[in-house]
């Protein structure tokens, strides 16, 4: 039996086309690309601005059920579907997020797809790529440095150091940095205060980069960032400290979308990378809107399950950017359905149709939720070799009872040839005119009501709890004019509830909001629930322990 190649072996063996050829497929002239080597480039802001009058293509969202810790192949399916659409004669472009080093060296792995449905150069994309995350981290931490420097030199803005909300960031999972005291060591080092680090993908600067439409909008949003409060409790903005201009300079190149290619030499934009459990979970508006002007079909993904990524895609990204999705694909795997049915991780490779049927309640909830936004749905069963015919048949039967269709997809093993059926179905749905997109809630209800609507309608919670300080903070923001903003829920990705161990489709649970953060520049309010952390930690045995350079100088263990 031939050995199965790893993702990195498949990617390394790929025949990549020069990036100028990929750009030419989209009508992008060589002089409008800023190359980073031979296989990746940024698309110039001038070219993007010139596309404004063109008609938009069809927008397809790929989302998923609540995942296992390894993920269910959402990015793999996004890439595979893009290749599949091109295979059947449609001009399709893939739009995905950039990879964070945290999960690369943690447990989940990279974010370039898998098997024969990958974007390349996989190693570059999963590591430093074009330096966007470095630029975002630098811009974020420049503001942090300016805050402490301002206080050191006399604190002209009367910033209350007890009420500074701006933390530092780094692109790594490091629980030791969550909470700390800075400026220790005497008078020369400033005024000691409590602070900490978040992971870069949770940074408001990341969200701003992904929601800004151009450099002018970027700088305006950066200036709107609230870093804390004065002694009179009025907000202090980044522009009050004259930080917005320098931050925009650091982000100037990062604002330009990155163009790469799939293994089948089809175009892909990889740009921005907020997590969906602690941020809004979507690639950049700039990349998505550019792709819509250049392709007939744009396939994009939103992080984790549809309760997180898809809800934020609809309620934040589409609302803010004026996007109207034409169809949605919900990725399900037999193993994740069995886990939602109560099967232990070590037993997921054993057939268990009864547990799978029980776990299908999770899939059913996600189908209903996406339909709630007025978007037609098809289910993609991402095939694993351990799946049995009986298990696949059970999923298809369950979905058919919902009035939808579940299609077995084998793009991981077969590339575009393994996903043609799904591609045809997506075209059928997108061309049908069924989509009647609308957000879940309006702008004018209170912030707490928005949280309650998401919790009750999407999570099926029975109650939302928050202490008086949280409720008062929300009311204060409403009085300051921020009441019309959407809400970004920070919640575990493993359950509809705030308990990662509560699988399936729980009803009547309690969603506890322990903290709220105002992202005035990004334009949303973050509600932090349960035990979710904005700086993750590494697992007991992180992937980093198995990543190394071999004798030939090639990377091993990256996936």
From Swiss-Prot:
EC number: 6.3.4.3
The entry's keywords: ATP-binding, Ligase, Nucleotide-binding, One-carbon metabolism
SUPFAM superfamilies documented for this protein: P-loop containing nucleoside triphosphate hydrolases
N-terminal signal peptide: none
PROSITE patterns in the record: FTHFS_1, FTHFS_2
GO BP field: tetrahydrofolate interconversion
Stored Gene3D superfamilies: Domain 2, N(10)-formyltetrahydrofolate synthetase, Formyltetrahydrofolate synthetase, domain 3, P-loop containing nucleotide triphosphate hydrolases
InterPro entries: Formate_THF_ligase (IPR000559), Formate_THF_ligase_CS (IPR020628), P-loop_NTPase (IPR027417)
Top-level taxon: Bacteria
Annotated ATP binding sites: 68-75
GO terms of molecular function: ATP binding; formate-tetrahydrofolate ligase activity
Pfam families: FTHFS
Top EC category: ligase
Pathway(s) this gene product operates in, as recorded in its UniProt entry: One-carbon metabolism; tetrahydrofolate interconversion
Catalysed reaction equations from the record: (6S)-5,6,7,8-tetrahydrofolate + formate + ATP = (6R)-10-formyltetrahydrofolate + ADP + phosphate
Family note: Belongs to the formate--tetrahydrofolate ligase family.
Protein name per Swiss-Prot or TrEMBL: Formate--tetrahydrofolate ligase
Species of the source: Rhizobium etli (strain ATCC 51251 / DSM 11541 / JCM 21823 / NBRC 15573 / CFN 42)
Gene expressing this chain: fhs
